[in-house]
Amino acid sequence: MNEEDIISLFYAKSHLETYEVLFPLAQRGNKFATYFIGNMLISPIDQTVEADVLEGIGYLKLSAKAGYSPAFEFLGNLYAYNEKVKNDLVAAHTFFYLAALIDNKVDIGYHLMIEDEFGISEASINKSKELAEACMAVGLENCELFKE
């Protein structure tokens, strides 16, 4: 299934029905399926899937490792704003910056908004950018952000 098919399924069916279709695709590494499985596990809309934030983050990281920029943005939001996830502004900034690098939109990315909103130090910003650039250099599958 491609991205459009999965988005249509996500909004047309219950989360449980969608989960049952997407889970085998996610197991085979479909970056769109892993993103939406993660999304459903973190924020189930219709309560047909039980929330599991840690498992959801795992699926989002798989999607991000495959280069899906919305997964980086979702992870950035989780680490910056979600009360169920330990606040880590450097990680949030790095995820947002990676999304901007992937989309070639470094000048307008969410990383700039959280720099202003949270007053992140220049040292932390530089650390984040260095980590993101290192991830791009070694390949996302080898990125330090994804090592447990």
Q: What are these regions, as identified by a protein language model?
A:
Residues 35-36, 53, 73-74, 108-112, ...:
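Alpha-solenoid helical repeat scaffolds
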Residues 35, 58, 73, 93-97:
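Extended, hydrophobic/aromatic-rich amphipathic alpha-helical segments that build helical scaffolds
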